[in-house]
Amino acid sequence: MAQDDQEINYFVRVHNTDLDGTKPVLISLTGIKGVGRHTAKFIAETAGVEKNVLMGKLDEASVDRIREVVSNYADRIPVWMSNRPKDVYTGVKRHLLGADVTMTVDDDINLLKKIRAYRGIRHETGQKVRGQRTKSTGRTGLIVGVKRKKA
């Protein structure tokens, strides 16, 4: 599992992401986009790795088990745990990790713009999307002072 006499690996490569080897496994795994604390705990427990050990002190076999669990994560979890419970195009459950998260969000926003949905129009015009008030907050641009009439 963890070797105390071995030097620490400062960067551990998992799912095309460099993870910090000086942090515990639970915290280090959250460096992957799409992996939070709950997901990291599930990955560590499924891989059989102690979650409080430094990531850089794990031996190669443990890191390989973590890589395997991360790559097959969507197959091991219930629907409510995935970050994409029903894909728009295929209708199947997926859990997106890494660059797939940002690409999919961008694709979803572009789809909303294309079909001229209300949310898509708000995205296009740069306005707030989720129903916030816009009269006094979220102002951008030049600051214009108030001019008073001469008495």
UniProtKB/Swiss-Prot annotation:
User: What does the UniProt keyword field contain?
Assistant: Ribonucleoprotein, Ribosomal protein, RNA-binding, rRNA-binding
In the UniProt record, which is one GO cellular component term? Answer: small ribosomal subunit
List, alphabetically, the NCBIfam families matched: PRK04053.1, uS13_arch
Any one Gene Ontology biological process term? translation
Q: Give the HAMAP family listed for this entry.
A: Ribosomal_uS13 (MF_01315)
Tell me, what does this protein do in biology?
Located at the top of the head of the 30S subunit, it contacts several helices of the 16S rRNA. In the 70S ribosome it contacts the 23S rRNA (bridge B1a) and protein L5 of the 50S subunit (bridge B1b), connecting the 2 subunits; these bridges are implicated in subunit movement.
Asked if the keyword Glycoprotein belongs to this entry, the reply reads: no
Q: Which InterPro entries match?
A: Rbsml_uS13_C, Ribosomal_uS13, Ribosomal_uS13-like_H2TH, Ribosomal_uS13_archaeal, Ribosomal_uS13_CS
The molecular function GO annotations come to:
rRNA binding; structural constituent of ribosome
> What's the domain of life for this entry?
Archaea
Assembly: Part of the 30S ribosomal subunit. Forms a loose heterodimer with protein S19. Forms two bridges to the 50S subunit in the 70S ribosome.
Q: Which PROSITE patterns match?
A: RIBOSOMAL_S13_1 (PS00646), RIBOSOMAL_S13_2 (PS50159)
Source gene? rps13
Q: Which family does it belong to?
A: Belongs to the universal ribosomal protein uS13 family.
This chain belongs to the protein called Small ribosomal subunit protein uS13
